[in-house]
Amino acid sequence: MRLQKYMAECGVASRRKAEEMIAQGRVTVNGVRITEMGTQVEEGDEVCVDGQLIRPETEKRYVMYHKPAGEVTTVSDPEGRKCVLDHFRDYPVRLYPVGRLDYDSEGLLLLTNDGALTERMLHPSHQVDKTYLARVEGSVSMDEVRQLRSGILLDDHKTAPAKVRVIKLEAYATVVLVTIHEGRNRQVRRMFEETGHRVLQLRRVQFGPLDLGELPRGKWRELTQEEVRSLTAYY
């Protein structure tokens, strides 16, 4: 079995992310650091990531976490900022986030040890819907709503059509519900910036079939069986 596939089956990361980890020199097989793709893993081999032995997980676990602003979704942070995974050090299995929420954003984050599901959900072909509640500076006009819906030019590439609905007009801000299926870096923030509106607060309220609901900020819960079925059936 290829090393990156083995890592995915251990729940470490998607194959694509596993390849990045290998290239960064974070993976060893039987004590030998691996940096090239194509390495085969045989039964009895000891694979370590960041010095920690990994093994395929037999029981898949799925957790919804309401990430607050001010936490990073990486496994560790060189700047010493608080990491999402700090909350799960004592969890029975090692969890990994499915995708990311940027440092200043909050909301629904899925964590799991199911590497195969992670890979499927993050693959561009599945176009997983991600819905955000954005509070932005100023008054968003209908012309700007139409621009956001049709696509905004970012890095010389137009964003895919988005679902956009104004929820509330405040004295100096607008609350907007936005659904996208792409995963560009800080995409929603940059889309609004291109229309002249700074994002004041951004919360992800839906991810695929999952709904954040009333889960308090900074709290987590395991998915219900119905929620797990909705994920595994579709993805």
Q: What kind of feature is each model-predicted range?
A:
Residues 1-235:
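Basic, flexible Lys/Arg- and Gly-enriched helix-loop patches that mediate nucleic-acid binding at interfaces
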